[in-house]
């Protein structure tokens, strides 16, 4: 169900609709493609328990009241019940419609034509305060329709949070801002603690999986630039597995990430969000995810979060506490 002008309307996955702001978008980001309609039975280790706790309902209420999107909802994250039940959420900035259409992602796609909510930075900061978060993850849709890709708006949100409480740790999982350094600088020049940009998959599968405007080395060069400009900021990336890659390609991707100074990497199982998206090619066992973690630590990452249900922002605060990283 999509809420449009205060009315709940059923919008079919893969179909076009008009947003409250007057522009067209595609539900779940990918048009109806029958050739992708392959259903693969999930193994038992991927089954999730629903937990509509008081904390879950509190987080839902706060984000709705402040007109905020969350990647938890828009990207159909399998961990939404667990995370929200623990009072944490990943806030998705600049609306719920992305200008890019990656073939794994269920976020709606379209052209927002420059629309932005000018109150969002303060609304996000107030929501973080109401949730009592000590560590917050911000992410956003890609906004190629904006001159700076939305970097200024993103930076204003980080600053608003830090102005409310400078002790709150902020992780910014950002777009690539088209690889333009002046845009990346806007994020670096805030008091952000962690900057993440997801590589998503191995080099060979980048264009079959990601939007053509994204790039394997564009992501790596983004992270390299961040580390060169601000060595004390932790850098992070994430890989999905199960899209047709080999373990050798995963290890090569780890090497490439380490070569540009990436500190933290996460690995999780790709799960097809709708029948229109890329099919799952394999389900990786929990034991193999443990092996990925072992290899990653041996390669020099400060931390490796690896497991079937791991997503880039999953338990982000606990990742750092576990290894006592100096935030």
Curated annotation (Swiss-Prot):
Cofactor note: Binds 2 [4Fe-4S] clusters per subunit. One cluster is coordinated with 3 cysteines and an exchangeable S-adenosyl-L-methionine.
Residues annotated to bind [4Fe-4S] cluster 1: 72, 77, 83, 313
PROSITE patterns: RADICAL_SAM
Pfam families: LIAS_N (PF16881), Radical_SAM (PF04055)
Keyword Protease listed: no
Alphabetized GO MF terms: 4 iron, 4 sulfur cluster binding; lipoate synthase activity; metal ion binding
Subcellular location, record wording: Cytoplasm
Keyword terms: 4Fe-4S, Cytoplasm, Iron, Iron-sulfur, Metal-binding, S-adenosyl-L-methionine, Transferase
Binding site for [4Fe-4S] cluster 2: 98, 102, 105
Reactions it catalyzes: [[Fe-S] cluster scaffold protein carrying a second [4Fe-4S](2+) cluster] + N(6)-octanoyl-L-lysyl-[protein] + 2 oxidized [2Fe-2S]-[ferredoxin] + 2 S-adenosyl-L-methionine + 4 H(+) = [[Fe-S] cluster scaffold protein] + N(6)-[(R)-dihydrolipoyl]-L-lysyl-[protein] + 4 Fe(3+) + 2 hydrogen sulfide + 2 5'-deoxyadenosine + 2 L-methionine + 2 reduced [2Fe-2S]-[ferredoxin]
Matching InterPro entries: Aldolase_TIM, Elp3/MiaA/NifB-like_rSAM, LIAS_N, Lipoyl_synth, rSAM
Family per record: Belongs to the radical SAM superfamily. Lipoyl synthase family.
Protein name per its UniProtKB record: Lipoyl synthase
């Amino acid at each position: 169900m999509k809420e449009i002008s205060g009315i709940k309307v059923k919008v079919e996955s893969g179909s076009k609709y008009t947003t409250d702001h007057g522009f067209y978008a595609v539900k779940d980001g990918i048009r109806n493609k029958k050739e992708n309609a392959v259903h693969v039975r999930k193994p038992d280790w991927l089954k999730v328990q629903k937990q509509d706790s008081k904390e879950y309902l509190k987080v839902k209420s706060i984000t709705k009241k402040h007109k905020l999107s969350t990647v938890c909802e828009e990207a159909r994250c399998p961990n939404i019940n667990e995370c929200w039940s623990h009072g944490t959420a990943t806030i998705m900035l600049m609306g719920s419609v992305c200008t890019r259409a990656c073939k794994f992602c269920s976020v709606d796609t379209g052209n927002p034509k420059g629309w932005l909510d000018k109150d969002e930075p303060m609304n996000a900061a107030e929501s973080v305060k109401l949730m009592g978060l000590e560590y917050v993850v911000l992410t956003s849709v890609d906004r190629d329709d904006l001159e700076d890709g939305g970097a200024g708006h993103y930076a204003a949100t980080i600053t608003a949070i830090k102005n409310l409480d400078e002790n709150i740790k902020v992780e910014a999982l950002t777009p690539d801002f088209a690889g333009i350094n002046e845009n990346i600088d806007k994020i670096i020049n805030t008091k952000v603690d962690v900057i993440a940009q997801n590589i998503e998959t191995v080099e060979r599968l980048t264009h079959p999986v990601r939007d053509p405007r994204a790039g394997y080395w564009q992501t790596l060069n983004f992270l390299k630039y961040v580390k060169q400009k601000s060595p004390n900021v932790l850098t992070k990336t994430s890989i999905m597995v199960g899209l047709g890659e080999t373990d050798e390609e995963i290890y090569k991707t780890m090497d490439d990430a380490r070569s540009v100074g990436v500190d933290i990497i996460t690995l999780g199982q790709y799960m097809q969000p709708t029948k229109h998206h890329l099919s799952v090619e394999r389900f990786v066992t929990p034991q193999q995810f443990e092996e990925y973690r072992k290899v990653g630590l041996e390669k020099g990452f400060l931390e490796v979060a690896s497991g079937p249900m791991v997503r880039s922002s999953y338990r982000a605060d606990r990742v750092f506490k576990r290894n006592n990283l100096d935030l």
